[in-house]
A protein has these predicted regions:
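Structural recognition of the conserved hydrophobic beta-strand(s) that form the central parallel beta-sheet
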Residues: 163, 198-205
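Cytosolic-facing regulatory segments adjacent to core modules
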Residues: 74-156
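Conserved H-loop
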Residues: 82-84, 202-207
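Phosphate-binding/switch loop-helix module in NTP-utilizing enzymes
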Residues: 131-192
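C-terminal regions of RecA-like/P-loop NTPase motor modules
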Residues: 1-22, 36, 55-56, 101-102, ...
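Flexible loop/turn segments at secondary-structure boundaries
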Residues: 57-59, 86-90, 169-172, 208-212, ...
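Hydrophobic/aromatic beta-strand patches that form the interior of the parallel beta-sheet core
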Residues: 49-51, 78-80, 135, 201, ...
Length: 360
């Protein structure tokens, strides 16, 4: 039965607020400071977080950062990884690579030192946890519903985070891909209300619309219509950001154009133009655009763009040496040989082998 009295629901909510205030219940931090701020401290009960971006722009990387941080800091969280895009083989290799700094081919094909083997075992042991469940292949909305309902029933007192990577990989059982995506989101909207502390992180792609306008700096900021497939995701999410790495799209000199006084908290990343305009320096930077914030601390001063510096230019790349020219200075007027009149010059061709007689 879906109907419940206001008294019953209010009493439950007041009890939950009391647990947060007393410290009995702790919010789930994502480990990403600007994201925790956007969430007003972290993942609270019923939150739906959307992460959108083009392929290879770091959506899965962010989700892996969040998962790693949650498992390291919150033992009472059950994390469900619906890894519909990357197999567990790839996920584990990526984790090892990120935490050791070694490339995947080096991990796979080079003999490890004793020190490296110790680190490798430590990382693998971190992944041998009972607190993570993997849905290691795409499923239909119906199977997703059944699996999550089962977890909810078996874990009424645990905090649960469900992460989907990514929405477009839903297994289509009937109708179109969009219909299946919508069906899954309808289930998320229902499931978030049937457990006292469950949150959802949903990854999705950007569509091709962005590529059609990215050459114009005035139109380079992502908008909600850039989200692939379904506007239901935008409607459902409490917080949604688009992650973009402009230099991967060939945008190297400047990114966006805006009044120089905008984005005052990002002054270190600006490139100032003529007059009152400025742009962002895109080199080695990842941009986070918060397209939706259902709740904010200060409506007047919303900070909805953040930048992470991935790497910086080498010194040799920052300045380009212009060719130099030196004008000779003479202390006395230079003396040139007497000019020969071309009219009186008669070259001899009697012997081309004699350099004295050569006309060249």
């Amino acid at each position: 039965m879906a109907l419940r009295t206001g008294k019953e629901l209010t009493n439950e909510t007041v009890a939950t607020i009391g647990k947060f205030q007393s410290g009995e219940l702790k919010v789930i931090s994502t480990g990403i400071d600007h994201l925790d701020d956007a969430l007003l401290s972290g993942l609270t009960p019923g939150i739906v977080l959307g992460i959108v971006g083009r392929s290879s722009h770091g959506k899965s990387y962010d989700m892996e950062r969040i998962q790693r941080h949650i498992l390291k800091t919150q033992e009472d969280v059950l994390y469900i990884n619906c890894n519909w895009e990357l197999s567990h083989f790839k996920l584990l290799l990526r984790d090892i690579s990120q935490r050791t700094g070694n490339s995947i081919d080096k991990i796979l094909f080079e003999k490890q030192t004793e020190e490296q083997l110790i680190k490798l075992k430590e990382i693998c042991d971190d992944n041998r946890t009972e607190n993570v469940l993997y849905q290691n292949e795409p499923v239909t909305p119906e199977v997703f519903k059944e699996d999550i309902e089962k977890v909810i029933l078996e874990n009424p007192n645990k905090k649960i985070v469900v992460a989907i990577d990514n929405l477009e990989n839903i297994l289509v059982s009937k109708g179109s891909q969009k219909e299946s995506m919508d069906a899954l989101l309808y289930q998320v909207n229902r499931l978030k209300n049937i457990h006292p502390y469950i949150c959802f992180i949903i990854l999705n792609q950007m569509n091709q619309n962005y590529l059609l306008r990215m050459d114009n700096p005035k139109n380079q900021r992502p908008i909600d219509s850039d989200i692939y497939g379904s506007d239901q995701l935008y409607k459902l999410c409490d917080v949604l950001y688009v992650k973009l790495i402009p230099w991967k799209l060939g945008i190297h000199e400047k990114f966006m154009v805006f009044h120089k006084d905008m984005y005052s908290w990002l002054e270190d990343h600006k490139v100032h133009g003529n007059g009152n305009t400025a742009s962002f320096d895109p080199y080695g930077r990842a941009f986070y655009f918060y397209l939706k914030l259902r709740a904010v601390r200060d409506e007047k001063n919303v900070q909805d763009v953040f930048i992470e510096q991935m790497f910086k230019k080498e010194a040799s790349e920052q300045t380009t040496s212009a060719p130099s020219f030196t004008t000779p200075l003479f202390n006395t007027p230079p003396v040139f040989e007497k000019e020969i009149s071309l009219a009186s010059f008669e070259p001899s061709f009697s012997s081309l082998n004699d350099p004295k007689n050569s006309p060249f």
